[in-house]
């Protein structure tokens, strides 16, 4: 915390969900006044039930709290080191949930609301911001979440372009590259086409025989589906967003004439046999550690997804960084629209945070709110703040949102989609662990665990250095 600087202009934060609440806390704790705008309870969304700040509208779980072996647990640890209000209130309202951090949702929201309401530098304004903020608001964080009100969403869309906001996002599963069996799969672009930034071998291809294809179609149709939430039912599908199981229901050959078409590709493992269908995976991050399954947006339940998708040749032992989904959402094409400090390129006084930026999950939304708050506080005090290292969970998530994602290899709609934190977003280790303390070689699951633990240890060490070298220097300047 720094000396209070009442001469600073207030930071206006629109939306008091997890991201907005965390951002407000960070800004105020760095000595800068905050006006936190929240339209509830005077204007409710289709999902919220109360006027409480940081209301959890779906699950009450913050997922794994294991900082050594799980990426979201590591993110928990990093946020705690930075004095996160969301993590403090989650810890104080924890309920039993095994290795996960789950909370009493009402107690959690009440604790966040009280902390912000009691802070001398935070003013909570219970009115709707129904358009672009006034021009004299020079330092603004927009953290209105996936259910942004229509007037504000329209204003943001007009400021950017019609395609900048998606209101029904299609999420395809993402697989860790090193879990794909390349003795069955191969790299090749359709017709060996070299697109922008491509090489002609930009996709991983998984072949299917006729029998495998028909068994796969049956499994898709029979798989257990997630029901739409009440506020999603009337939302139409957009072009290119049909769930794969809906396509399968329209005809047994639909998929092999759509995302699974086998044309323009030759299997080098068996070049004389033409596959009946082919599943393609496309690189999903610049590091090349994550690949998404092209066209596989789905409403299958997660258990059904892992069971069905692991029947694909080459994906029998696939590890998923994210499973698929299709739900109503509002998010920006952040790599195109935001700079590295989450500011809108078209109007830099506006900074975005939370799920609107393309992160997925409670913890990730709060984490981006935390970073946005630190940046806004630095701007208000005319200070410069370096980004957290990309080797940290915070830096890896920020890097993915603002530029770590590949927009597109070939022609077609943008591919940026919401993402949970996962180890695939981190830069590879320079010297990954290969041996146990006794000198024997690490293999299988032991090797995977050792790698995750090394990434986590590196992250916390680098975060501590960043706090000492960048954050404290910026705060004290």
UniProtKB/Swiss-Prot annotation:
What are the alphabetically sorted keywords of the record? Cytoplasm, FAD, Flavoprotein, Methyltransferase, NAD, NADP, Transferase, tRNA processing
Q: Which cofactor does it need?
A: FAD
Keyword hit for tRNA processing: yes
**GO molecular function term, any single one:** flavin adenine dinucleotide binding
Enumerate the Gene3D superfamilies for this protein: FAD/NAD(P)-binding domain
Which HAMAP family is this protein grouped with?
TrmFO
Protein name per Swiss-Prot or TrEMBL: Methylenetetrahydrofolate--tRNA-(uracil-5-)-methyltransferase TrmFO
Report which gene this protein is encoded by. Answer: trmFO
């Amino acid at each position: 915390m720094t000396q209070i600087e009442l001469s600073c202009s207030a930071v206006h934060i629109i939306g008091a969900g997890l991201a907005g609440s965390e951002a407000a806390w960070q800004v105020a704790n760095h000595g800068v006044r905050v006006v936190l705008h929240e339209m509830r309870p005077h204007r409710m969304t289709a999902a919220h039930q109360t006027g409480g700040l940081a209301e959890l509208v779906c699950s009450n779980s913050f997922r794994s709290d294991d900082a050594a072996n799980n990426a979201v647990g590591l993110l928990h640890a990093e946020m705690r080191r930075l004095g996160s209000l969301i993590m403090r209130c989650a810890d104080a309202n924890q309920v039993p949930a095994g290795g996960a951090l789950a909370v009493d949702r009402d107690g959690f929201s009440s604790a966040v609301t009280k902390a912000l309401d009691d802070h001398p530098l935070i003013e909570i304004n219970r009115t709707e911001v129904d358009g672009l903020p006034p021009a004299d608001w020079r330092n603004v964080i927009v953290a209105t979440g996936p259910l942004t009100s229509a007037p504000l969403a329209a204003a943001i869309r007009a400021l950017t372009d019609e395609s900048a906001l998606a209101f029904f996002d299609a999420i395809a599963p993402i697989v860790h590259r090193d879990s794909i069996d390349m003795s069955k799969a191969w790299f090749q672009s359709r017709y060996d086409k070299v697109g922008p930034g491509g090489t002609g071998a930009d996709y991983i291809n998984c072949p299917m025989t006729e029998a495998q294809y028909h068994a796969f179609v049956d499994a898709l149709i029979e798989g257990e589906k997630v029901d739409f939430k009440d506020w999603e039912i009337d939302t139409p599908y957009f072009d290119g967003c049909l769930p794969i199981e809906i396509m399968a229901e329209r005809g047994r050959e639909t998929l092999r004439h759509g995302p699974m078409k086998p044309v323009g590709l030759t299997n080098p493992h068996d070049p004389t046999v033409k596959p009946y269908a082919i599943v393609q995976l496309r690189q999903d991050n610049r590091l090349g550690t994550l690949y998404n399954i092209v066209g596989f947006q789905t409403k299958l339940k997660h258990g059904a997804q892992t069971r069905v998708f692991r029947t694909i040749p080459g994906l029998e032992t696939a590890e998923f960084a994210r499973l698929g989904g299709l739900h109503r959402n509002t998010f920006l094409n952040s790599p195109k629209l935001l700079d590295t400090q989450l500011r809108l390129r078209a109007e830099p006084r506006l900074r975005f945070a939370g799920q609107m930026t393309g992160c997925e999950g409670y913890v990730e939304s709060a984490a981006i709110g935390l970073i946005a708050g630190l940046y806004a506080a630095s701007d208000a005090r005319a200070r410069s703040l370096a980004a957290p290292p990309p080797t940290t969970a915070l830096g890896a998530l920020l890097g993915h949102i603002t530029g770590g994602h590949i927009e597109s290899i070939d022609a077609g709609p943008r591919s940026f989609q919401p993402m949970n934190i996962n180890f695939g977003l981190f830069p590879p280790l320079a010297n990954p662990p290969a041996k146990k303390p006794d000198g024997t070689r690490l293999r299988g699951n032991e090797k995977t665990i050792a790698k995750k633990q090394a990434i986590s240890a590196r992250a916390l060490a680098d975060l501590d250095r960043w706090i000492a070298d960048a954050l404290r220097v910026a705060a004290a300047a």
